[in-house]
Amino acid sequence: MKNIEIEDDLYKYILANIEAFGETPSQILRRLLSLPNASPDNATPITSSVTPSAPRQEAVNDESSVFEAVTPKVLDRANISLPEPLAHGVNALFDSEVFKTEAVVTNKFMMLLATMYYENKNAFEDAADKTKGRTRDYLGQNLNALLAADSEEEQNFFKASKPRNIPHTPFWVITNANTGRKRIIITQMMASMGYPHYLIERIKEEI
């Protein structure tokens, strides 16, 4: 896969043609151009938010890299419309048909994190700073920091955790964790953000 730069209006056009949660730029373009589908293992979910003042994020060179994505020159996040299931908070997301029928745990995990971010951005950022493993951050805004390691063995292990952009946010999160670890991440985030206990308890049922 290759990194490319596209102008803001083209990027917004791609975003406007997302038909399914987690759909990648390649999948969207293949559909729009009526091209045959490629292997899903080579796809990276589309990222819909980039901080204009930040330098462009370089992709990590790895034969199974999951970090390469289409990067726009400028994107005004205020002009991005959230998919309907993500726009009304966690309680509404749990009850939405899209969430209930989603069979892939990682997709539910990402939907929850995106919804939590837009429900309270400041609280989400604070919670992200506190939600960590023993030696690793689980999520953050700086992919290079997430990939930082004291040894090559540690770095290779973390690359295998497949950090991915949380859709419609500037955050990345590890995704190649088991369901129990994903529940822990969501539970810690929700507790730090002050969600009511009954909603936090639903994580065990919903993921």
Swiss-Prot record:
GO CC annotations, alphabetized: cytoplasm
GO terms under biological process: negative regulation of DNA-templated DNA replication initiation; regulation of DNA-templated transcription
InterPro entries given in the database record: Arc_rbn_hlx_hlx, Ribbon_hlx_hlx, SeqA, SeqA_DNA-bd_C, SeqA_DNA-bd_C_sf, SeqA_N
A GO molecular-function descriptor: DNA binding
Any Pfam family matching the protein: SeqA_N
Keyword hit for Cell membrane: no
Compartment list: Cytoplasm
Region span, Disordered: 43-63
Keywords attached to this entry: Cytoplasm, DNA replication inhibitor, DNA-binding
Record field: compositional bias (Polar residues): 43-54
HAMAP family, per the entry: SeqA (MF_00908)
Subunit structure: Homodimer. Polymerizes to form helical filaments.
Family: Belongs to the SeqA family.
Role according to the record: Negative regulator of replication initiation, which contributes to regulation of DNA replication and ensures that replication initiation occurs exactly once per chromosome per cell cycle. Binds to pairs of hemimethylated GATC sequences in the oriC region, thus preventing assembly of replication proteins and re-initiation at newly replicated origins. Repression is relieved when the region becomes fully methylated.
Protein name from the UniProt record: Negative modulator of initiation of replication
Organism per entry: Psychromonas ingrahamii (strain DSM 17664 / CCUG 51855 / 37)
Gene (UniProt): seqA
